[in-house]
């Protein structure tokens, strides 16, 4: 799935149609793909993919009983294999949902991942997606008033899976991250008690509406530490906007980032395409690197934007 070079100006519809709710449903009307029809496909790559998909569904195939999600994971791994990527993390909110969704997803993951790793050599691991705000843009969408507490309770259970390696606070950045302090504190406590390698990722500073969210995200984690507990693995998704880095407050933020060892994850294509970055000269990455802040670049969902690591590296080269 690619969107060419489109810029998404209506973020609400972007959420509805392209991201959260673009969940495939298996068609009841199957296409009878005969060899003569396949040979008429003009695109060589598509023809090759169709042949592989049909092969995956043959009687002797280990993938013949794959669910739609398992097929997606398989093809994601195959694409990463082509790009030379060995390890990838994906966020999924089903892992934070009460009852059947989390259980069903774990069952599917545990069933398919050994087969995927054997074929491709690609390790896919998962972050538990926790929405920073409940969804209200979908008609009849019902969200519990205690959804954050429910998410944390589920997190403690599913985090036992070897395929689950962290948590990720996601969603449109329209609220102060301090609102999530209780949930962050519970995750930090879990890390201290159960799994020191568990990651906390918080999306912050993606737009310029709440410039204190990057600092507050780090402080929410730091202030949640138990006595003598070390700073856990903490990543900030985007970190594009914060207080002015030329001010005393900005310099203190740079020192805080360095001292706590947080990793700032940049996604240039995503920032541009979601209209969050219109002037490349205002990007803070040079200041971060000059102050020894840990930075890493990603695609923020390469399937949606049609980019790969090479294109993102070229964009970064042009920026630097």
Where do the language-model regions lie?
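Metal-cofactor-binding active-site regions of metalloenzymes
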Residues: 1-320
């Amino acid at each position: 799935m690619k969107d060419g070079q489109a810029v998404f100006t209506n973020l609400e519809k972007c959420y509805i149609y392209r991201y959260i709710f673009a969940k495939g449903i298996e068609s009841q009307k199957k296409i009878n793909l005969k060899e003569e029809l396949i040979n008429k496909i003009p695109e060589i790559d598509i023809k090759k993919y169709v042949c592989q998909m049909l092969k995956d569904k043959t009687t002797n195939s280990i993938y013949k009983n794959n669910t739609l999600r398992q097929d997606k994971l398989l093809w994601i791994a195959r694409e990463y294999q082509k790009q030379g990527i060995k390890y990838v993390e994906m966020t999924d909110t089903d892992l934070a949902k009460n009852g059947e969704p989390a259980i069903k997803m774990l069952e599917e993951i545990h069933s398919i991942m050994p087969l995927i790793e054997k074929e491709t050599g690609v390790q896919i691991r998962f972050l538990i997606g926790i929405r920073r705000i409940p969804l209200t843009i979908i008609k009849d969408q019902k969200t519990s008033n205690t959804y954050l507490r429910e998410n944390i309770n589920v997190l403690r259970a599913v985090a036992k899976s070897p395929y689950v390696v962290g948590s990720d606070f996601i969603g449109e950045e329209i609220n102060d991250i301090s609102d999530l302090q209780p949930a962050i504190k519970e995750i930090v406590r879990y890390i201290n008690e159960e799994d020191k390698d568990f990651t906390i990722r918080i999306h912050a500073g993606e737009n310029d509406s709440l410039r204190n969210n990057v600092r507050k995200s780090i402080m929410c984690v730091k202030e949640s530490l138990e006595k003598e507990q070390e700073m856990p693995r903490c990543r900030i998704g985007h970190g594009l906007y914060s207080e002015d880095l030329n001010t005393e407050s900005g310099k203190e933020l740079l020192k805080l980032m360095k001292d706590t060892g947080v990793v700032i994850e940049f996604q240039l294509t995503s920032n541009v395409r979601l209209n969050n970055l219109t002037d490349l000269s205002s990007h803070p990455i040079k200041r971060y690197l000059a102050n020894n802040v840990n930075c890493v670049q990603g695609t923020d969902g390469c399937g949606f934007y049609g980019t790969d690591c090479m294109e993102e590296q070229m964009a970064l080269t042009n920026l630097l």
